[in-house]
A protein has these predicted regions:
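Forkhead-associated
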Residues: 39-112
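Sensory coupling linkers of modular signal transduction proteins
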Residues: 119-129, 192, 314
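PAS-family sensory domains
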Residues: 114-117, 186-188, 309
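C-terminal catalytic subdomain
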Residues: 17, 225, 296-308, 313-372
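… and, occasionally, acidic/histidine-rich disordered N-termini of signaling adaptors
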Residues: 127-305, 358-372
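Signal-transmission/dimerization alpha-helices at domain junctions
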Residues: 112-122, 206-215, 315-316
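Intrinsically disordered, low-complexity acidic Ser/Thr-rich regulatory segments
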Residues: 1-61, 73
Length: 372
């Protein structure tokens, strides 16, 4: 199978006779590339070899992976990994392997840019997980289909990057004209993970897209937040709530009106200075009935760049296990080429370099809006 220009080839082998009992726990080797699972291989009696050579059981086309890099064996009920003298090494917990090593369940080794994770699953668990993954994929594809295309021309341009987590969170965003002089942009982050959170974000997105809030002026951020809060109380929606950043830009005055509901600030970069933090006080949508929301506004100079992002973009864990936050994230933004296409993906790559290997814990969403 191919992902991002590289290939992981799995040659299926016979699983041990222990697998004949359908509900026995089995060991699987999960291949993870750029945070995504690309293969899952049962570990049985046969020793598995990993490397670049096409003759290996698991073939990984990565220049940092040797032709014969690693072997994986089941010994006395334990999964044991052994580096076979590879050029660039195999690592567990940041340490290079120098001898055969037990790989416990839910732990991984790294070779090149790939992770090999040990999972223990029963047959029934695998069936349930496969069904859940099918549901998640459908929900993921539906959310993705609702996201707007980037705007590459005009006085206001957009660029974004969205990478759902393995569990699928509730991120969604949109932007576009309200009338001939006003543009809107907003980002929603629903609590929780899974299909329910994703579908809740879709419901919110559809209400916003259809302007289905009676007597609400969508040019007034405070009114919009109050209308959403009245329609999406958490006790009526399975305990789900969401945070929101909502902004309206007026072309003729260059003023940006905005309001937030439990969401961190949008960051406005202008003239090479430190970013302006655009945030107002107010709880998340659905938490407090009858909540009053107040907006604020700022002037947007020519050449400004606005970043909107979910908390999954900055709440990541470093390879050393340290929790990172906005302090580490903000320096990744801006820069001389920040307004060019691909800016949002550049931020994602920079965050991945700061984070520990493996999938990010939450959805990653970054929206960059450039103003001429």
């Amino acid at each position: 199978m191919e992902r991002g220009g590289s290939t992981v080839l799995v040659k299926h082998t016979t699983v041990s006779e222990a697998a004949a009992l359908r509900d026995d726990l089995r060991s699987y080797l999960v291949v993870i590339e750029h945070g995504e699972i690309v293969a899952r291989i049962a570990v049985g009696l046969e020793t598995l070899t990993v490397g670049r050579d096409p003759a290996r059981h698991i073939v990984i086309t990565d220049e940092k992976v040797s032709r014969l890099h690693l072997q994986v064996a089941m010994l006395a009920g334990e999964v044991v990994v052994e580096d076979l003298g590879s050029s660039n090494g195999t690592f567990m917990d940041g340490l290079r392997l120098s001898s055969p090593t037990v790989l416990p369940p839910e732990r991984w080794v790294q070779l090149g840019s790939r992770l090999l994770k040990h999972e223990r699953r029963s047959h029934r668990e695998m069936e349930r997980e496969a069904e859940l993954q099918r549901d998640l994929e459908k929900a993921r594809a539906y959310v993705q289909s609702l996201l707007p295309p980037p705007v590459r021309a005009g006085d206001v341009r957009t660029d974004w990057f969205h990478r759902p987590s393995a569990a699928l969170g509730g991120d969604a965003f949109n932007y576009g004209p309200l009338d001939g002089d006003h543009l809107v942009a907003y980002l929603v982050d629903v609590s929780g993970h899974g299909v329910e959170a994703a579908m809740h974000s879709v419901s919110v997105l559809n209400v916003m897209r259809q302007k289905a809030l009676p007597s609400v002026d969508f040019r007034d951020p405070g009114q919009v937040l109050e209308g959403l809060n009245a329609n999406f109380q958490m006790e009526e929606h399975g305990g789900l709530f969401f945070t929101l950043w909502y902004g309206v830009y007026c072309r003729s005055t260059r003023r940006l009106r905005f309001a937030t509901a439990g969401h961190h600030a949008g960051l406005l970069f202008a003239g090479g200075s430190a970013p302006e933090h655009l945030r107002t006080k107010g709880p998340m949508i659905g938490a407090v009935p009858g909540q009053h929301y107040v907006g604020a506004e700022t002037v947007v100079p020519p050449g400004s760049l606005l970043y909107l992002f979910s908390d999954g973009a900055f709440e990541v864990t470093s390879p050393e296990g340290r929790q990172l936050g906005l302090e580490e994230f903000i320096p990744l933004l801006g820069g001389p080429n920040a307004g060019t296409p691909g800016e949002a993906e550049r931020v994602y790559v920079a965050v991945r370099k700061q984070a520990r290997p493996g999938p990010l814990a939450d959805d990653f969403s970054v929206l960059a809006v450039s103003f001429d």
